[in-house]
């Protein structure tokens, strides 16, 4: 993540590289603003910088996700309708007590996705840390069950009174609409 605040942060990159090397990892910086990417490019032209759409943010109005009104959200409504017709489900508030089930679902999800193993392992570690410090980090989330099986969960936190950030969202895609329902 790009450091926050004013001023030039590029002088910190050698320290970040040393820290990554000590952890046996290559240095990866994500979440750069266009200005931050330009600063890194100027200070370290040897670095490769590219866009990864898999890590881009999606911004929705909370009311839009709650109500799903309009033509734009028709596909989401269709997913929800199919899910509700097909499954007897329940939604629960996410608590750290559900961590083992969430980690199991994450492992199942990861097994079905072709991606960079190091990135996925880092995500798994981050998820475990999030559960370990759930209260301290003021995290909130939801869990979706079909019968007794956890089929989706989400973890996030309030950015301010008007914005909420989803940090992790996983669903068993064999349950059509699970991602959409956990979002609602």
Region annotations inferred by a language model:
Residues 8-18, 175-184:
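Conserved acetyl-CoA-binding loop-helix of GNAT-fold acetyltransferases
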Residues 22-34:
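Conserved GNAT acetyl-CoA-binding A-motif
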Residues 32-37, 76-78:
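Short, polar loop motifs at secondary-structure junctions
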Residues 45-116:
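Acyltransferase donor/substrate-recognition loop-hinge adjacent to the catalytic core
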Residues 101-149:
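Short, conserved active-site entrance elements at the starts or edges of catalytic domains
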Residues 36-47:
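Short, aromatic/basic amphipathic alpha-helical patches
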Residues 139-184:
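Aromatic (often tryptophan-rich) hydrophobic motifs at membrane interfaces
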Residues 1-7, 13-14, 162-172:
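Conserved acetyl-CoA binding element of GNAT-fold acetyltransferases
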